Amino acid sequence: MERPRGAADGLLRWPLGLLLLLQLLPPAAVGQDRLDAPPPPAPPLLRWAGPVGVSWGLRAAAPGGPVPRAGRWRRGAPAEDQDCGRLPDFIAKLTNNTHQHVFDDLSGSVSLSWVGDSTGVILVLTTFQVPLVIVSFGQSKLYRSEDYGKNFKDITNLINNTFIRTEFGMAIGPENSGKVILTAEVSGGSRGGRVFRSSDFAKNFVQTDLPFHPLTQMMYSPQNSDYLLALSTENGLWVSKNFGEKWEEIHKAVCLAKWGPNNIIFFTTHVNGSCKADLGALELWRTSDLGKTFKTIGVKIYSFGLGGRFLFASVMADKDTTRRIHVSTDQGDTWSMAQLPSVGQEQFYSILAANDDMVFMHVDEPGDTGFGTIFTSDDRGIVYSKSLDRHLYTTTGGETDFTNVTSLRGVYITSTLSEDNSIQSMITFDQGGRWEHLQKPENSKCDATAKNKNECSLHIHASYSISQKLNVPMAPLSEPNAVGIVIAHGSVGDAISVMVPDVYISDDGGYSWAKMLEGPHYYTILDSGGIIVAIEHSNRPINVIKFSTDEGQCWQSYVFSQEPVYFTGLASEPGARSMNISIWGFTESFLTRQWVSYTIDFKDILERNCEENDYTTWLAHSTDPGDYKDGCILGYKEQFLRLRKSSVCQNGRDYVVAKQPSICPCSLEDFLCDFGYFRPENASECVEQPELKGHELEFCLYGKEEHLTTNGYRKIPGDRCQGGMNPAREVKDLKKKCTSNFLNPKKQNSKSSSVPIILAIVGLMLVTVVAGVLIVKKYVCGGRFLVHRYSVLQQHAEADGVEALDTASHAKSGYHDDSDEDLLE
């Protein structure tokens, strides 16, 4: 990967304990767009799709606080008045449900994946590798559990004791297909690669020799797990229709490929040299029949990706080194130019989040600044409004703290870079309409970064802090079925501090916070929020876990092992419905180290199933109970049935969040600022951008030039409000034609037939006509981005798929996207 720019180089200065971003002098690197949106949060009734796993190296945990103390205690300022009494007989109950497994294994790393949802099947792959002068020696072991990690069986013989390539991971099939693919190491002279396939939840494996050497992990079609996609080391695109038993190369010179809806495949191809050499001159193709026929849907492509129902492409502008985002909602048959600033060679785009209603887009600022601007789209993904200035995003390949709080709709948390280079956290409760600082926790004091010791706010540590090697073991955590709960490391002051953080919890989706635990911890949520488990982050061996049955108000300590272990990971089944937690680590003696896991089942702590009177009604987003609009966000309010903190009972695996929505009348809070307007900080009204005053707002929409008359507001995509305020907004057709030529697909290709000559002649005539129109209209509509004049393109260009537009990926566990820079190297 290319060398990160600016702040991503990791050089920091720390005056007054602030986390600051240092400006660097070396020239900036070329930007890489990141156009793949992170996958949406899981639905209330989890249907896990795709590999979800954890991977740890053989190492001790990073330095942390003291060894956890035993006993019970209460955090400050609890939300309910209660004593932290000791749970009856909890030590005996947990002791009877603690299962140790010692692995007779000296491997240097462990990878863990769940196979299916609620199946109890876990695969563990250990690897040991010693690099020699020319070749490397290694071995792998594969273990399987079918009781959530309480017991493991060595099944290495099922893969013929073959060394498995860990860079490909364990490719787990979608839904509960039970499919698993492991990619094996082969000798240098082999004609192709080798995989081991299982379709029965890893009970059996079949060895398959490939006619190619894979470059990437096998990609399952979301609609049919028998359909697989793979890129070869020679840039060939290969497809299998029978779960990898047989393969067919459907195209050569492919740079990037992705599955779209309905088994559509989108891919970019180079025509002159290589993927890197042709970056910005790639072609985007689509096949809807697994490679029988093809259609070129875009040219001059820099990168592309998928998010929600949108297909995005980063496209080079004519006679320029800038590029623009184009959007399609019909798999690339027609395209529209997004009303966003163009970016130069050293900048990037990044899709932070996308769903069927809207897109969060980060646009990098010119220069080596380490920040950019967040824009939010309309429901077409075309017209964008400025949402947040100075958004921290260090570089292509760098990190952003942008976090979707999945436990409450409309809530996102991220970081901004202040003028003094300090980093501050911001939160939005209305999907980017307004951002504000996080409230100071009631049971916390302002730290040394605060100018006023009585006025400060909470600042959240996320991906950027982790990338800078601060003492932050985990990113913020929330789960869709644990309504309102958010857990995160943070500091309380005027900006993020480099001092040792504490752990904070919110039970209302981020409106209010309380210190939950002192010092850094690992944490996870079980039983849809019924239990929270934590382990202190320490460089010493540990044997104590903490758990809470009342959303972090009171904590119990449990010694899970007489012999402390070097802790490496805390694992629970994705979806937060499980009652089991696995603690992974290793023990070491003078000459040896051994992997060990402890799986603890909390089923006897929550002995009874929850009943109706264990739940209480809770109005989400409630800030002013006396106001009839209280709780109205995005046009409606929601009342939830939530577990009482005092109830010690089990929600169960089949728990479904119960909620009752009701429509609200429209108010200013239901509107974003329209194109050309913005909301000043801490203001509710939109004001016109100074540089736009007196200018006519004209744009090109689907080939027609139109005039926009607006009072500065447009409804938030997905907002359901009815009646009430309705700011005037009118789009008038000026009866003038316009076009844009950034995307210009020239041909439709088929394996079975060539394009007739007569169609080529007709196409040439059409191109000539279009070129004439473009010359006439070049400065009227389209072309380079203007602040007060914007252009929308309709052309037969690209297909659905926006992954990895310009920026770097977030996380590497299946919840974030790959970047072009990763795939082009």
Curated annotation (Swiss-Prot):
InterPro entries: Sortilin_C (IPR031777), Sortilin_N (IPR031778), VPS10 (IPR006581), VPS10-sortilin (IPR050310), WD40/YVTN_repeat-like_dom_sf (IPR015943). A lipid is attached at residue 781 (S-palmitoyl cysteine). BNR repeats lie at residues 143-154, 196-207, 238-249, 285-296, 326-337, 375-386, 426-437, 504-515, 546-557. Pfam families: Sortilin-Vps10, Sortilin_C. Residues 1-31 form the signal peptide. A motif (DXXLL motif involved in the interaction with GGA1) lies at residues 820-824. The chain crosses the membrane at residues 755-775. Residues 776-825 are cytoplasmic. GO terms for biological process: D-glucose import; endocytosis; endosome to lysosome transport; endosome transport via multivesicular body sorting pathway; extrinsic apoptotic signaling pathway via death domain receptors; G protein-coupled receptor signaling pathway; Golgi to endosome transport; Golgi to lysosome transport. Residues 32-73 form a propeptide. Highly expressed in fat, brain, and lung. Expressed in neuronal bodies and dendrites of the piriform cortex and hippocampus. Also expressed in the islands of Calleja, medial and lateral septal nuclei, amygdaloid nuclei, thalamic nuclei, the supraoptic nucleus, the substantia nigra, the Purkinje layer of the cerebellar cortex and the cranial motor nerve nuclei of the brainstem. Glycans are attached at residues 96, 160, 272, 404, 580, 682. Disulfide bonds join 84-554, 255-275, 446-456, 610-649, 632-664, 666-721, 673-686, 700-738. The keyword Nuclease does not apply. One of its GO terms (molecular function) is neurotensin receptor activity, non-G protein-coupled. Residues 74-754 are extracellular. SMART domains: VPS10 (SM00602). The modification Phosphoserine is found at residues 809, 813, 819. It is found in: Golgi apparatus, Golgi stack membrane; Endosome membrane; Endoplasmic reticulum membrane; Nucleus membrane. Belongs to the VPS10-related sortilin family. SORT1 subfamily. Functions as a sorting receptor in the Golgi compartment and as a clearance receptor on the cell surface. Required for protein transport from the Golgi apparatus to the lysosomes by a pathway that is independent of the mannose-6-phosphate receptor (M6PR). Lysosomal proteins bind specifically to the receptor in the Golgi apparatus and the resulting receptor-ligand complex is transported to an acidic prelysosomal compartment where the low pH mediates the dissociation of the complex. Interacts with LPL and SLC2A4. Interacts with the cytosolic adapter proteins GGA1 and GGA2. Interacts with numerous ligands including the receptor-associated protein LRPAP1/RAP, GM2A and NTS. Forms a complex with NGFR which binds specifically to the precursor forms of NGFB (proNGFB) and BDNF (proBDNF). Interacts with the Trk receptors NTRK1, NTRK2 and NTRK3; may regulate their anterograde axonal transport and signaling. Interacts with CLN5. Interacts with PSAP. The N-terminal propeptide may facilitate precursor transport within the Golgi stack. Intrachain binding of the N-terminal propeptide and the extracellular domain may also inhibit premature ligand binding. This is Sortilin. It comes from Rattus norvegicus.
